[in-house]
Swiss-Prot record:
Name listed for the protein in its UniProt record: UPF0299 membrane protein VIBHAR_02118
Transmembrane segments: 6-26, 35-55, 72-92, 95-115
UniProt topology in membrane: Multi-pass membrane protein
Record keywords, A-Z: Cell inner membrane, Cell membrane, Membrane, Transmembrane, Transmembrane helix
Cellular component aspect of the GO annotation: plasma membrane
Membership in a protein family: Belongs to the UPF0299 family.
Subcellular location: Cell inner membrane
Pfam families: LrgA
Top-level taxon in the UniProt lineage: Bacteria
């Protein structure tokens, strides 16, 4: 029983180390290149491609990823508090925020419709 729990803990620590290692690599790449993409996004791409290439197995990352997903709601609490602290600024910029959200959604929807129309015409 204790041996199984200890083994689970080791797997979790390895998983978290892999995820944090990918994050560190992503942050390093972002700092060295100065690209405007966040280091966390680059890190997740590094992790994705290392899993795609078979360098990292899904089973190795799954315990840590499951833990993050299980407690994801707690990670949004600081963001929500920050929004409430700057609610007046959010209200002052409500129109541009809504316009960009609606406009961006329409652009994606129309682009997807054109692309699907093109693909369906190619098949027939």
């Amino acid at each position: 029983m204790i041996k199984d729990r200890l083994l689970q803990l080791v797997h979790l620590l390895i998983s978290l180390a892999l995820i944090m290692g990918a994050l560190g690599i992503g942050n390093t790449i972002q700092n060295l290149t100065g690209v405007s993409v966040p280091g966390s996004v680059i890190g997740m791409l590094v992790l994705f491609f290392s899993m795609t290439l078979g360098l990292v197995k899904v089973e190795w990352v799954k315990p840590g990823a499951t833990l993050f997903i299980r407690y994801m709601i707690l990670l949004f609490v600081p963001i929500s508090v920050g929004l409430m602290q700057h609610f007046d600024m959010l209200l002052a910029n409500a129109l541009p925020i809504i316009a960009s959200a609606v406009g961006g959604s329409l652009i994606v929807l129309i682009s997807l419709a054109w692309f699907l129309d093109y693909l369906l015409k190619e098949k027939h």
